């Protein structure tokens, strides 16, 4: 959303015209209300739970509250936009995000640096 704040609607329309699904992302400092107008318009909202740029960062603890707010608004609007979370996802933070309403998780460092990656996937899938 931050990349094209003044032309988001045009970009969404162009992506749709190309026959593709549309997702938008928000950084940790962006108020979640900024994505509310796009619920039901885009297919996915990616909530960044770290500052974008590099892997291995610590999960920002306010992320579940942000997810819950988007989820509540999604329910209020009766739409099915997916909520995805990326950044600092592991076997502790992933379940918090799922409990808050996330549909998808992106697990990078915690998965690829694990002694048993399959065990990490199993824990995340079980929540």
Q: What feature does the model see in each segment?
A:
Residues 98, 110-127:
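C-terminal helical cap(s) of enzyme catalytic domains, especially alpha/beta-barrels
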Residues 45, 70, 86, 97, ...:
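Conserved, mostly hydrophobic/aromatic
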Residues 30-42, 87-105:
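Catalytic cores of alpha/beta
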Residues 22, 104-105, 111:
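A short hydrophobic/small-residue beta-strand
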Residues 51-53, 88-91, 111-112:
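Short Gly/Pro-enriched loop/turn and capping motifs at secondary-structure junctions
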Residues 9, 60, 95, 117-118:
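Conserved strand-to-helix beginnings and helix N-cap segments that scaffold or border functional pockets
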Residues 1-82:
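Conserved anion-binding
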């Amino acid at each position: 959303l931050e990349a094209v704040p003044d032309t988001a609607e045009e970009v969404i329309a162009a992506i749709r015209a190309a026959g593709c699904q549309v997702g938008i992302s928000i950084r940790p400092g962006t108020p979640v209300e900024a994505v509310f107008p796009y619920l039901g318009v885009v297919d996915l909202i990616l909530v960044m739970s770290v500052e974008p740029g590099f892997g291995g960062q610590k999960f920002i603890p306010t992320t579940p509250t942000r997810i819950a707010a988007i989820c509540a608004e999604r329910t209020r609007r009766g739409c099915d936009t997916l909520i995805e979370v990326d950044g600092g996802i592991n076997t502790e933070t992933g379940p918090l995000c799922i409990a808050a309403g996330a549909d998808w998780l992106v697990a990078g460092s915690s998965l690829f640096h694990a002694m048993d990656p399959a065990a990490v996937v199993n824990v995340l899938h079980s929540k």
